[in-house]
Amino acid sequence: MPRRLYVQCRLFNVNDRLATINLCDRIDRWIDMGLLVGMEHTFLPIRDDPVNVANELEIFNNDIAAINECSGLTGFFDGATYDSGCSFEIGYAYTLGYPINLVTTDFFKWTPSGSSNFFYCSQLLNTVATLAAVPDMNPSISDYRQKNLEQLERVFSILQNNLVFDFGTIKPLKPRIEALPIEYDYYLDPNFQYTEAGRYLQNQIVDAIKAANKTFVYGNNMGLILTDIENLRKSGRGIFYSDVFEPDLDSGILQGIAYGIGRKPYTYASNSKQYLEGADWYGYLNCMITYSAETIVTSINELTGLIQS
């Protein structure tokens, strides 16, 4: 198997694409310098995937195959929601035992609910990945360009050190994360809990599970993250909440883990907003979320029927 870094990329605007291409060029230079031992040049899907891809299912399959052929994952990760497909790729790569090294330049930190602990992006992301973070906010417009360039250089220096730690010598990957014997029929996405609409839906789902004499466990991304991942691994099926244009990054990561352990989830998505990419119509969910789910559930009645069956 080649030693190679899969570089995730938010595709939807020029700035993100250019930033990722520049990141690949920088990492490739580190490889040429011998800092990352035995590594091939980076794999960037938008640059290296096969051409003439016919549809989103092919994109999904190509990216899963590419991740399987790599040995680590890296990329920019700025923003609280970011891109759900990138979140999925992190969760899936985590199940393969890959080192995951990400860059964030946000000065925001986030906490779920009333917790006093704040994290870059999320506590879950900080558990499954190593983040290179320089959260400066320059309050002055004077010399703003130079200050931002200096911030990038500092964050790249941290990333380089993190990558050298993981790939400066040849070492085996961590064991793959597998499913565990089933103790719960369903695992409920913790992100149901953070809005009134989500809590209302979760109560209806819990009622349906109890009515079907089945069992469940609440997801919890506020406490012991590894325990929460273990509960997902002990569940027959996850039920995830993707009812916004860009689902919370934790939902994407957890769905990647569920897919990686071979238990494809139900993904709740009643949002009817759609979009065009070029001349092609798509639904509003990222293809990595769509095709890693057992089914996309569009109403609580449909979900209740699945639980009862």
Question: Model-flagged regions — what are they?
Answer:
Residues 1-309:
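Conserved catalytic or regulatory cores that recognize and/or transform ribose-phosphate-containing ligands
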